[in-house]
Amino acid sequence: LNRSVLKFGGSSVSDFKKIKNIAEMLKTRIEDGEELIVVVSAMGKTTDQLMNNVSSLTSTPKDQELALLLTTGEQQTVSYLSMVLNDIGVNAKAMTGYQAGIKTVGHHLKSKIAEINPNIFDEAFKDHDILVVAGFQGINDDFELTTLGRGGSDTTAVALAASNQIPCEIYTDVDGVYATDPRILNEAKRLEYVSYEEMMEMSALGAGVLETRSVELAKNYDIPLYLGRTLSNMKGTWIMSKSDLLEKKAVTGVALDTHMMHVTISYPLPDNQLLTQLFTALEEESVNVDMISQIVNLEGLQLSFSIKDSDAHQISSILENLSTHFSALDYKINEAYVKISLIGSGMRDMSGVASKAFMTLINSDIPFYQTTTSEISISYVIDEENGEKAVEELYHAFEI
């Protein structure tokens, strides 16, 4: 069967004109003999508006009720798109995450997909040409609606592609994957191919075009992943395992993460109980920790790490609670930092990348406060005001 998953982000379906244009494009592909599973996000800023509504009512909504509310954004979009498709002669069916058989586990607002039954789609395609599925959502074992967290619609699309063993195309308001953010550097080049590994690093380190777990899912099931601009003839980027298609440069891209917070904790004694309680609480609240560094000496314990700024409420609550049990605990949460990262699979085989990056920042009068590395990336915590300057200096230094 000539079957694919297509996903359209919130900016691509932000108004009815765009939804109608997408419907016409989908009709053309159906007429060419394809069967399509279409995943959509909420229209434009719908999710933000729902959150603003909640803020007007309460500062402490229960996660279960909040998840239930947030799923309505995507459900509106699938209904609208399916209505338009049927109106222009395409036999379409709208499906919630629950109707699509997306079973989830974990936190109501950060659930993970546990299982998808592909037989649901085989049956549905007997009577329909297009299945329009609400992204970002599923249902848990208690029959409660859950959401998948940041990038959840991308994850939905890739998971559906994996369960059906078909390609996945993700359409948004960018032309593909760039070596760095073209909004920061106009000359940034678009990459025709990127390996799964490099894309995962770019996503994790702030590139923003795709969420890490959706790329990881594609890698695990070897699903070809395409990223392109909605309704554009310009070529996008293929994300795949064939790294031999890539240029063998040490550095493929530069990523700037502006959605981070830097946390520093000090305690006059090296106390393992403090660390145990801290990391247990972080795990329970599904707060991902990055760039961890720890110093233990005669003066006590100092721990630094970074988190996503979307976890601001959780980290504040966790640290306030710890302070009641460890009265000498001192902590600072700094939102005026950003993370600049170099990414490239060629780093495995080439030396001198770290020293060159170090000297570039020093010569550009850009101080950094923390460094971390992986096999194919190097990251620095720097002042927010130096973020865009660092992107430009490193991009040119490595002739990306």
Positions of PLM-derived features:
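A conserved regulatory-domain signal marking ACT and ACT-like small-molecule sensing domains
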Residues: 238-400
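Surface-exposed amphipathic alpha-helical tracts and adjacent flexible/coil segments at the periphery
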Residues: 210, 221, 232-238, 312
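Nucleotide/pyrophosphate-binding catalytic subdomain
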Residues: 1-215, 382-383
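Acidic-aromatic/histidine active-site loop/patch
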Residues: 218
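Conserved beta-strand termini and adjacent loop/short-helix elements that scaffold enzyme active sites
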Residues: 95-97, 228-230, 292
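Terminal amphipathic helices with adjacent charged low-complexity linkers/tails
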Residues: 41-47, 227-244, 300
